Swiss-Prot record:
The gene is cwc26. This is Pre-mRNA-splicing factor cwc26. One of its GO terms (biological process) is mRNA splicing, via spliceosome. Residues 106-116 have a biased composition (Low complexity). It comes from Aspergillus fumigatus (strain ATCC MYA-4609 / CBS 101355 / FGSC A1100 / Af293). It comes from the Eukaryota. Residues 124-142 have a biased composition (Acidic residues). The lineage of its organism: Eukaryota, Fungi, Dikarya, Ascomycota, Pezizomycotina.
Length: 344
């Protein structure tokens, strides 16, 4: 039904009708297609639109105009399937380019295979520094990929899961066996100082032993320096007696001349009759071989006689005299105590 007859029908039946407008309708603008197949390179703007340009485009849009979708790639760009690269100095034919690309790909694959084989051969030859090439297809894995946790990727059956668990157990046992077979010195603790340098424990222990030995030697030397010549001679004589006692009989009788001479040489202040039986030798030389003083002298704790050059003057502080007086007083008190106990 034509528009005019429709308006008349509505006016006749319902008494309302929109008047026919003489305004021409807008037609959709058609974009001109540009053949880009013959052109070389197509440059597309990959930068995302910013807020300012988006707002400007939104204000300039016509509500009644056609909607343009900018995210869709052009048909010409999708239609361009062939490469527009040209070889300088040679014929730009499609068959030659395809052959060249195929040859280049074959050369790359051949070089990669040769490099992999050479690396694998070096690894079998015993080069520890060469990178190890590990195949993803393991005997226990069945050639399947595994996730980082060690489980197979994808769905598995109960048999596959049991086989995977058994393989993991075998790996753990093999690793534990390697750790047990490893020597103990390889597991020695590494000590480091504050700066991070490794400390040689054996060297430090040797230095500590050396320092301890030097300290002991210094102490012995200091103790030796405090001793006089007489003490050293007496110590040497005592050592000599111990050496001779090894060959000495256990029972020493009256026929032992050495023992008799030693007992006769002893002087006792409370045995005046001993002077009639034995002849005492006068002061001759000391233990060190030097002559002794022949006159009277103040007694001392060690019984050492003064040298022959002594002038008879006692230059001490009187300690020896007080020491003998204290010992005599203590002896008298003990004797009196014993007598008083007997009287009671």
């Amino acid at each position: 039904m034509p528009p005019s007859s429709l308006a008349e029908y509505l006016a006749k039946k319902y008494l309302t009708a929109d008047p026919a407008t003489d305004r021409p309708k807008k037609k959709r603008k058609k974009t001109k297609t540009v053949d880009t197949a013959g052109d070389g390179l197509i440059i597309a703007d990959d930068d995302p639109p910013d807020l300012r340009t988006s707002a400007t485009n939104f204000d300039n849009e016509d509500d009644e105009g056609p909607s343009l979708v900018t995210s869709v790639r052009s048909a010409e760009f999708r239609r361009a399937k062939k490469s527009n690269w040209r070889t300088v100095g040679g014929p730009a034919t499609g068959s030659s380019n395809a052959n060249d690309e195929r040859d280049a790909a074959d050369a790359i694959l051949a070089s990669a295979a040769a490099e992999s084989a050479a690396r694998r051969g070096e690894g079998e030859g015993g080069d520890d520094e060469a990178p190890a090439v590990v195949d993803e297809a393991d005997a226990d894995d069945g050639g399947e990929l595994r996730m980082e946790s060690g489980a197979r990727a994808g769905l598995q059956t109960a048999e596959q899961t049991a086989a995977m668990v058994a393989a993991q157990e075998r790996r753990k046992k093999a690793e534990a066996a390697r750790h047990r077979e490893r020597p103990a010195e390889a597991q020695e603790t590494i000590y480091r100082d504050a700066s991070g340098r490794i400390i040689n424990v054996a060297l430090k222990r040797a230095e500590a032993r050396r320092a301890e030995q030097e300290k002991r030697e210094k102490e012995e030397a200091a103790k030796e320096a405090l001793m006089g010549d007489v003490q050293r001679a007496e110590r040497e004589a005592r050592r000599q007696q111990i050496q001779e006692a090894r060959a000495m009989p256990l029972a020493r009788t009256i026929e032992d001349d050495a023992l008799n001479e030693e007992l006769k040489a002893q002087q006792r202040w409370n045995d005046p009759a001993a002077g009639f039986l034995t002849k005492t030798k006068g002061p001759g030389v000391s233990v060190t071989g030097k002559p002794l003083y022949k006159g009277a002298f103040q007694p001392n704790r060690y019984g050492i006689r003064p040298g022959h050059r002594w002038d008879g003057v006692d230059r001490g502080n009187g300690f020896e005299k007080e020491w003998f007086a204290a010992r005599n007083k203590k002896g008298r008190l003990e004797a009196l105590d014993y007598q008083w106990q007997m009287d009671e």
